[in-house]
Amino acid sequence: LVLDGVFNHMGRNAPIFRSAEAEPASVYRNWFVFGPQFAGGARAWWRAENLPELNLENPEVREHLFNGHDSVVRSYLRDGVDGWRLDVAFDIGFVYLEELTRAAHAEKPGSLVVGEIANYPKEWFPSVDAVMHFALRHLILRLVNGEMDTVTFARMLERMVTECGIENMLRSWIYLDNHDTPRLATTVPDERARRLAQVLQFTLPGSPNLYYGGELDMPGGDDPEMRAPMRWDLVSDDNAALAWTKKLIAMRQHHRALRVGDFRPISSHRLLAFERHTDQVAETVLVVANPGDEAVTETLMVANSKLMDSTEMVNLLAQHPGAPIRLWASLLQVTVPARTALVLQPQVAPPGGYTNYKRVQ
């Protein structure tokens, strides 16, 4: 259970702010920044007068929010929550985020602090344990909507994984929509492109983060549509989006490499291809995605020395077995239909009892 913490600002009608605003001698006066230069009389988040910002430079504020024994962050962790998702974490800044994260870990080792950070994530670690992956969301949506080619996507992704580190990537949340964005069914109107985006959400290094209704293809544009109530009328056994989401969840649960595996890019001209792997070759997963409008046949080099020649690869997303896909001397020829992905795993224990993986794990 991860709670949403808004520690940068509060509502104008909050008793603490009302006291500070009304009484210059209030004990809460220095919890905010007042002055005639601000519309509404106090510094407010993005100049929204109803959202006065907290003065985090005041140690008393930080003591109340996260440093003190009875602070908001620490008391809720003691009560059993597992972590915090920090609203507008980029506004809190590196220094105070790191202070908050240290306080959380001191109170509850292993607790998670996830920052809503729209910036390039590299330097925000270890100020937070993880980020909401704005950059990866934009990359995925641009790819499946035909606004970015696979080579550019692969280059940017590889740089981000290398610079941020795989552990930080694995902890971070991969989301495709939330309460601040139009919903996926609206931003990606093509159904096959939408399904492809979801495959990437569940196979790229990170933790998939689902927004209620997304599993049902619930539509929604700008505010207030993006925050509309749940569409319970869409829940049915016939909902293809729900069935697809359940399939992706089960696939990720059953294949360890998709949860904790390392990442290795696979070079391609027209496809997006990458490998997720652990210390066990049997857990290796290859992902080959085609965001284009036409089927693509290409030969890829899979630079994994543990994968044996002539290994058959099983497509984890296939409804019915198709033509066998085999790895020959590290080369893999694939045909990927338009706006589709293959998620392949090596068959290391084929029927018949013999395996050339007997001394390779």
Go through each PLM region and give its residues.
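Substrate-binding/active-site clefts of carbohydrate-active enzymes
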Residues: 1-79, 100, 104-107, 123
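Structural recognition of the beta-strand scaffold that forms the well-ordered cores
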Residues: 2-3, 84-85, 112-115, 173-175, ...
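Conserved, mostly hydrophobic/aromatic
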Residues: 4, 76, 86, 113, ...
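Active-site-proximal helices and loops of the catalytic beta/alpha 8
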Residues: 17-21, 71, 82-168, 172, ...
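A structural motif
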Residues: 78-81, 129, 206-207
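Short loop/turn motifs at secondary-structure junctions
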Residues: 80-82, 175, 335
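Short, solvent-exposed helix-loop connector elements
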Residues: 182-188
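Carbohydrate-interacting/catalytic domains
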Residues: 194, 205, 210, 216-361
